[in-house]
Amino acid sequence: MKFFIDTANINEIKEANELGILAGVTTNPSLVAKEGVDFHERIREICGVVEGPVSAEVISLEADKMIEEGKELAKIAPNVVVKVPMTKEGLKAVKAFSDLGIRTNVTLVFSAVQALLAARAGATYVSPFLGRLDDIGHNGMDLIRQVAEIFAIHDIETEIIAASVRHSVHVTEAALNGAHIATIPANVIGALVKHPLTDQGIEKFLADWEKTQEK
């Protein structure tokens, strides 16, 4: 499973990239708005840092306007992926983008059949949301597993991005259940690196080393 970072913060992206694990970036209008910067300029800046796919989301809800926006986003850099909501209009736009050779990430996927529809429309990626399903008493990981099984049965090449990741257990279970990618906030990436036994082990090694230097 590959790791994307879910942010529009350049410093967070650079820090994750330095770890050698970063395969791509996902953004959304809320994340960019939080940065208080021009949307297109920030996407261009991110594409200059990361070689992998960078998802940039359209704002419009009508297919023709989504297509217009997406074409402009795709001009920013060759690694831009146009992020489209899972709606009827979104599916129309995905089909048009597929015909144009523009890669897409269908977001706000909450059922396996939505993922299948998006894949058949030509989506490059689908993004099932884990945390938001968990919030309403559903098991988001069941969705990842269902989508992975359906795609495997029908030999579908669309990649599954586990989104709305809240903690390290989400990441582990997404990998076990067939997600190709997990897109993760910076704070969760930081948590993945840490384990209390690792810290204890380092402390013990250092303490033992200091004892040898005292002799």
Swiss-Prot record:
CDD domains: Transaldolase_FSA. Transaldolase is important for the balance of metabolites in the pentose-phosphate pathway. It catalyses: D-sedoheptulose 7-phosphate + D-glyceraldehyde 3-phosphate = D-erythrose 4-phosphate + beta-D-fructose 6-phosphate. This is Probable transaldolase. It comes from the Bacteria. GO terms for cellular component: cytoplasm. It holds the Pfam family TAL_FSA. InterPro entries: Aldolase_TIM, TAL/FSA, Transaldolase_3B, Transaldolase_3B/F6P_aldolase, Transaldolase_AS, TSA/FSA_arc/bac. The active site is at residue 83. Belongs to the transaldolase family. Type 3B subfamily. It is an enzyme of class 2 (transferase). GO terms for molecular function: aldehyde-lyase activity; transaldolase activity. Keywords: Cytoplasm, Pentose shunt, Schiff base, Transferase. It is found in: Cytoplasm. The keyword Transmembrane does not apply. It comes from Bacillus cytotoxicus (strain DSM 22905 / CIP 110041 / 391-98 / NVH 391-98). GO terms for biological process: carbohydrate metabolic process; pentose-phosphate shunt. Coiled coil: none annotated. The gene is tal. Pathway: Carbohydrate degradation; pentose phosphate pathway; D-glyceraldehyde 3-phosphate and beta-D-fructose 6-phosphate from D-ribose 5-phosphate and D-xylulose 5-phosphate (non-oxidative stage): step 2/3. Its EC number is 2.2.1.2.
